């Protein structure tokens, strides 16, 4: 018997365990604005705070209509480099609407990292300044 098939068992177990932890995405409340997150591979973008208060689920933001400040953390990896950077960013937007879906899209060019807040029509309505990055 070959050793390779036996090595697949721990790898598959880890994948299944990690996917089970996340759970399904909750349904968006019609009275709230929903902000999804989108990052460039291999980076991970996580929701951290709304108006200074920690969020329960780092995969999205859900806010009441109006003015809010969203804080995010980006775990950035350079292709071919094992060093990870932890980057913090903030976006402020005054016109969140109930029932509207938004997307916070991370993009990077060289060492410059930013994120754009897009409304449901794909129009940029706000953006972060450059992220503050430190070695992770």
Stretch-by-stretch model annotation:
Residues 1-24:
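Sec-dependent bacterial lipoprotein signal peptides
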Residues 21-136:
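Short loop/turn and low-complexity linker motifs enriched in small/turn-promoting residues
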């Amino acid at each position: 018997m070959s050793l390779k098939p036996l090595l697949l068992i721990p790898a598959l177990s880890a994948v299944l365990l990690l996917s089970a932890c996340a759970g399904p995405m909750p349904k968006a409340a019609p009275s709230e604005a929903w902000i999804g997150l989108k990052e460039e591979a291999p980076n991970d973008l996580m929701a951290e705070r709304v108006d200074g208060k920690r969020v329960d689920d780092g995969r999205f933001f859900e806010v009441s209509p109006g003015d809010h400040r969203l804080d995010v953390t980006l775990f950035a990896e350079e292709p071919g480099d094992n060093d990870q950077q932890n980057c913090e960013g903030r976006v402020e937007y005054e016109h969140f609407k109930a029932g509207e879906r938004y997307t916070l899209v991370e993009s990077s060019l060289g060492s410059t990292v930013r994120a754009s807040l897009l409304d449901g029509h794909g129009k940029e309505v706000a953006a972060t300044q450059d992220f503050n990055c430190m070695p992770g």
